[in-house]
Amino acid sequence: MLTDVQLQRYGRQLLLHDFDIAGQEALQAATVLIVGLGGLGSPAAIYLAAAGVGRMILADGDVVESSNLQRQISHTEADIGLNKATSAAATVAAINSDVQVETITHTLTEDELSERLQGVDLVVDASDNYPIRFALNRACIASGIPLVSAAAVRTEGQLAVFYPAAGGPCYRCLYPQAGDDTALSCSESGVLAPVVGVLGSLQALEAIKCLANFGEPLIGRLLVMDFRTVEVQRLVLARRSDCPDCQHLSRPQIT
């Protein structure tokens, strides 16, 4: 049950005609795992904390470097040398002390994901390599929870919610084979800071929609954006009958 202080704090989003107290309480009861606290994970964590998600698990094995500060807004100059999950956790706690924050300060392995996802309601994939993306996809399928995935490089980005348990495709339906990890790497290809800011914020939005049963999440849809021209495409994603990860599921396909 929300307190008077919380009702005041979240009042602006509670004014929305289709976002009610039940939705806010669902956020408060939710646990979200964010993998990667860089350019995407930073704004996602900040906005989910501000929106009132009750418990967040922040996972990143990297440390903050000066080159990160151009776009990774959960870190400051004072955080250089700190683990990114630790740094982001301090930022989240400063924004909303009601949020229970836990950290994983090493790179997650697939073997430990099934245990780590116990009690988790949703995963935000803000990682930058195919092996962990594939591992998160398999783990979310096994746990029956949504995976909010985004990628950004240069001035381009994409966003989708992969949720086979709700009838949608999975990440491997879109990417059956691993590509070149350098294509996902800002350090190799460059990126403009607002690009990851927008994509990470949209990840938070999609997470809120899934958790609070609000609006229409991007399940079975892929949002593709070119920020150089501000061109946006919304593509339909189909489940692959030969998908190596979700072909065993018999859920109806979203149309």
Question: Where are the language model's segments positioned?
Answer:
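Adenine nucleotide-associated cytosolic modules
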Residues: 1-255
